[in-house]
Amino acid sequence: MTASDAIRWARRVRSERPPAALDEYLAGFEAFFNDYAGRVDYWRTRNPGYHETIASLARFYVPRGARVLEVGCGTGDLLASLEPSEGVGIDLSAAMVARASERHPHLEFRHAAAERLDLAGREFDYIILSDLVGYLFDIRGALERLRAVAHPRTRIIINWYSRVWQPVVHLLEFLRLKYPLPLLNWTTVGDVENLLRLAGFETVRSRGHILLPLRLGPISRFANRFLAHLPVLRWFVWTNWVVARPIPRAAPSLPSVTIVCPCRNEKGNIEQAVRRLPALGSRTELIFVEGHSKDDTLDECRGVAAAHPELDIKVMVQSGTGKGDAVRLGFAHATGDMLMILDADLSVAPEDLPQFYDAMVSGAGEFVMGSRLVYTMDPKAMRFLNLLGNRFFGLLLSVLIGQPIKDTLCGTKVIWRLDYAHLAAGRAHFGDFDPYGDFDLIFGAAKLNLRIVEIPVRYRERTYGAPNISRFADGWLLLRMSALAAGRLFFAA
């Protein structure tokens, strides 16, 4: 069956009522792709650059060793390139499935239509739909079936041709520079996001990729990695990408919590921190991480812990320096399901922590941060230059991570321990670049495609001690960290 035959079939059956229309639609398209299976390698070798770039982008979004389902897997090459611990490919074409099984015998391939997918009892960490939505008879129905194989942390990754290039694609097919494929759905990003919502998913981030879909060495790499993300030029990318997650449901049980409290020269705040700390979840663990203080903070932490044997309090001393090192030490020894940071200066009140807990348990966020820039703060809580710097870095990081944030440097941050384990395992992607820990967590959460939300808090003037920051030196360091992250996150794929 030729592409024109398949298109005529599809247009006719789409106007009929299912299930008869769907049966005919699938039969026609399977016949077409069974025939195309014998030609696919030839046409891909004519322009390998596009498919190599798609595989590179998919590897950016999907870590090695994950459980991956690809719907519309074709010959299985993209799925194999992701190096999954468990890889399952689904395709409408029996001929494509046969070729995929022959090429990649270590992976599992099944002959099935996306609209009739049934993998009862299976769950996957990532579900890939690469260049598939253009062929689906019922996009919403296919997406709804994916809910059955998704757990709360599953990420759906969808890419498809941008509608901007529809006339060019047809021209290339007419000139026989591209094999004519029966693409019928030229959807926008808004269309796909709406269909995802209807199917029970919400978008975490969306982005365009690939300005130059050719293998032209450094020219293509420069165009696709840098130029494709610049204003105006990003309107002309070839592919749209959406990362989505299941719309969250409230946790069935109360998760336990570990609160890590880095403290350096904060002796006068330790007793208050313990006294004002609310009980959270099924169990609350408090870990003080002392940072070589000069005011007996360590002795105060130990004394307060001994005075409250009814509470689960641990005291640790960091071997390194900086808040980031203290947080990493505390998180490494935490036993709670949920990990929180509470700065020992108490400029964010311990009484605010239940708001963060509720946002996590409800599923509203997977990485929750405080924002000091919503409510009016105490007059002396933040100096003017610090306020300007915070607003600037909020805008900058919103662009870099693709999710809106206002306050990057509020010390109160919350993440699931399981997600933090993945973040720590992938820390080499950015390197050990952040002595404060804020950017390390933000960029790591963005790389994992976690839903980032902010909780407005009232920022109070500290009542003891002095700030442990230097405005100009620290601002310059934050700029350098932002530049590094831009290269490894915003311009990385």
Task: Give the role of each language-model region.
Residues 74-116:
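Class I SAM-dependent methyltransferase SAM/SAH-binding core
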Residues 290-299:
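A conserved acidic beta->alpha catalytic loop
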Residues 339:
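Short aromatic/hydrophobic "clamp" motif used to bind/position activated sugar donors
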Residues 140-152:
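A short glycine-rich, Lys/Arg-flanked "PGG" loop and its adjoining helix->strand segment in the class I
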Residues 2, 8-10, 224-257, 268, ...:
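Hydrophobic helical membrane-anchoring modules
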Residues 110, 298-333:
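Conserved donor nucleotide-binding strand/loop of the catalytic core
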Residues 5-63, 217, 226-227:
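Conserved class I S-adenosyl-L-methionine
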Residues 165-185, 318-333, 350-431, 435, ...:
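Acceptor/aglycone-binding surface of glycosyltransferases and processive sugar-polymer synthases
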